[in-house]
């Protein structure tokens, strides 16, 4: 399947989907489809077409996003955008950026969208440097699982690169690291967690209204002042007083909320709800105030 510039993006998504459908019709079902992008690809442009495309729903689903990080050079990529100048300039023009302030590099986008992050070439850095890299990555994406390797060798594929089921459910363990709050180690992208009480039925609709507003309209509900923001990933786990547990997943402006399976086994029909946001400007206090005002808390 030849791809222009080595990647699939929004401008050719119909071609990419049709090519995979045609391949499966000719060769039958595959156990797994691993789509490898170039080093300058934006996962946010690719993931939604596999995650929510109804035409592929019966045979293909998005299992997860894996990002490979160069331990030796990733900080340089995040801080100065080395090798990413053209994409950075395009983003600045699209957002009418004046050239000042933190850079939004492709490295930021690839880390912020990931479900698993593999830090490679760890043999080329010291323990202190590796810790700095790990903390910087964690500040950008507090939800992703992080694994360190040398020469891209991972101990096993299943559960780390394959069979992630990253969009099937959201557990307390998934949100554990992010629940400590947001970090300011990276000036561009942050992970922020909002906690709130168990919802009643009426508040469930209000919660959905809040999600639609921040993702589709890129604004906050009510009259809460805010600075411009950009949400890359969203995960939520919301217990409801009637015993249900709702899980929410989002990539860019697309999201879905489903009822968790096996709630009785999980034993978590009650308790604290959590909403985790990853993106640009998501660490402002206005998000929490807007959600609480919308829910009437």
Please report, for each region that a protein language model flagged, where it lies by residue.
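Long protein-protein interaction modules used by eukaryotic assembly/scaffold proteins
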Residues: 273, 277, 281-297
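Cofactor-binding loop segments of dinucleotide-utilizing enzymes, especially the Rossmann-like FAD-
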Residues: 70, 151, 280
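Nucleotide-state-sensitive switch-loop elements of NTP-binding domains
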Residues: 1-105
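Residue-level preference for the first positions of well-ordered beta-strands
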Residues: 31-34, 116, 274
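Residue-level signature of catalytic and energy-coupling elements of molecular machines
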Residues: 16, 36, 65, 114, ...
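Conserved strand-to-helix beginnings and helix N-cap segments that scaffold or border functional pockets
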Residues: 13, 44-47, 127-131, 288
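C-terminal accessory "lid"/substrate-recognition subdomains
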Residues: 86-263, 284, 293-294
């Amino acid at each position: 399947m030849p791809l222009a510039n080595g990647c699939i993006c929004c401008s050719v998504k119909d071609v990419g989907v049709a090519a995979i459908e045609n391949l499966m019709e000719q060769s039958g079902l595959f156990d797994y489809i691993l789509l490898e992008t170039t080093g300058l690809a934006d996962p946010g442009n690719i993931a939604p077409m596999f995650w929510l495309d109804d035409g592929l729903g019966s045979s293909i689903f998005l299992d997860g996003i894996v990002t490979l990080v160069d331990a030796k050079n990733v900080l340089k990529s995040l801080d100065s955008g080395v090798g990413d100048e053209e994409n950075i300039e395009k983003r600045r023009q699209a957002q009418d950026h004046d050239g000042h302030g933190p850079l939004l590099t492709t490295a930021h986008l690839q880390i912020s969208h990931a479900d698993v992050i593999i830090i490679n070439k760890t043999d080329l850095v010291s323990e202190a440097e590796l810790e700095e890299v790990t903390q910087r990555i964690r500040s950008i994406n507090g939800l992703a699982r992080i694994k360190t390797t040398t020469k891209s060798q991972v101990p096993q594929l299943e559960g780390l690169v394959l069979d992630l089921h990253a969009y099937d459910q959201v557990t307390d363990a998934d949100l554990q690291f992010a629940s400590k709050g947001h970090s300011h180690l990276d000036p561009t992208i942050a992970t922020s967690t909002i906690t709130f009480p168990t919802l009643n039925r009426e508040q469930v609709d209000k919660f959905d209204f809040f999600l639609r507003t921040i993702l589709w309209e890129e604004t906050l509900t009510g009259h809460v002042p805010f600075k411009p923001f950009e949400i890359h990933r969203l995960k939520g786990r919301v217990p409801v007083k009637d015993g249900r547990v709702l899980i929410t997943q989002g990539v860019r402006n697309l999201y879905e909320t489903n009822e968790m399976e096996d709630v009785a086994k999980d034993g978590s029909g009650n308790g604290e709800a959590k909403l985790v946001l990853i993106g640009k400007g998501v660490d402002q206090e206005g998000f929490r105030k807007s959600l609480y005002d919308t829910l009437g808390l």
